[in-house]
C-alpha cells in the first residue's frame, strides 16, 4: 500500500459510547496506542467530545509507563486546554505532572526531579479539591497517592548548588 492512497473510515456517531467503552478497555489492557486511535476516530465525527478527550489525555499519559514510547508533553497540554471544565483542566494537569514524575522515579539520577513533579501535581490536586463537584474525592486520592510516594521513596528536593561544595 502506498502511503496516502487510502482514507480513514468514519465511525457512526451513534456508536460513540460503545467505541469509547472499547477505548477504556484498551487503556485497562495497557494498550494506550489503541485507545488513542479510537479517540482520534471519535474526534473525526465529534471534535469536541469531552469523554473522548479525557480518555485521550489519559492514554497519552499512560505512555509514560511504556519504556520506549514517544510521549508528547506539548500534545497532552494542548488537549488538556480543550477541556471545558476548569476543574478538569486542573485535575488532569495534575495527573499529567504526576505520571511524568512517576516515570522519573525509574531513574535514580532523576529522583529530585520526580519530587518536584509530584509536588507540582500535589499543588494542582489541592486546587482541584477546592473546585471538585460534591462527593468527588478524586483529587484527594491523587494528592494522598503522591504524598505516599514521596514518603515511601524518601524523595527530597534538589540540593542547591552551594550545598554541593
Regions found by a protein language model. Give the residues of each.
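TPR-adjacent "capping" and linker segments in tetratricopeptide-repeat scaffold/adaptor proteins
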Residues: 3-18, 80-83, 112
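Terminal, low-structured helical/coil segments at or just beyond the last alpha-helical repeat
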Residues: 6, 127-165
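Canonical positions in the second alpha-helix
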Residues: 8, 42, 79-80, 128
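Amphipathic alpha-helical repeat scaffolds of TPR domains
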Residues: 13-18, 46-62, 84-107, 137-149
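Alpha-helical segment of the N-proximal tetratricopeptide repeat
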Residues: 15-38, 107
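Short coil/linker segments at helix-helix boundaries
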Residues: 62-85, 92-125, 152-164
Amino acid at each position: 500500500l502506498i502511503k496516502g492512497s487510502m482514507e480513514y473510515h468514519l465511525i457512526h456517531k451513534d456508536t460513540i459510547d460503545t467505541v469509547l467503552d472499547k477505548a477504556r478497555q484498551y487503556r485497562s489492557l495497557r494498550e494506550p496506542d489503541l485507545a488513542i486511535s479510537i479517540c482520534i476516530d471519535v474526534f473525526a465525527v465529534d471534535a469536541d467530545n469531552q469523554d473522548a478527550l479525557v480518555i485521550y489525555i489519559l492514554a497519552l499519559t499512560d505512555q509514560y509507563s511504556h519504556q520506549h514510547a514517544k510521549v508528547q508533553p506539548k500534545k497532552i497540554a494542548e488537549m488538556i486546554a480543550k477541556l471545558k471544565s476548569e476543574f478538569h483542566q486542573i485535575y488532569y494537569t495534575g495527573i499529567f505532572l504526576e505520571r511524568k514524575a512517576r516515570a522519573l522515579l525509574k531513574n535514580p539520577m532523576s529522583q529530585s526531579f520526580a519530587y518536584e513533579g509530584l509536588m507540582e501535581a500535589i499543588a494542582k490536586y489541592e486546587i482541584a479539591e477546592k473546585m471538585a463537584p460534591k462527593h468527588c474525592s478524586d483529587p484527594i486520592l491523587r494528592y494522598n497517592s503522591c504524598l505516599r510516594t514521596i514518603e515511601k521513596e524518601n524523595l527530597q528536593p534538589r540540593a542547591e548548588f552551594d550545598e554541593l561544595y
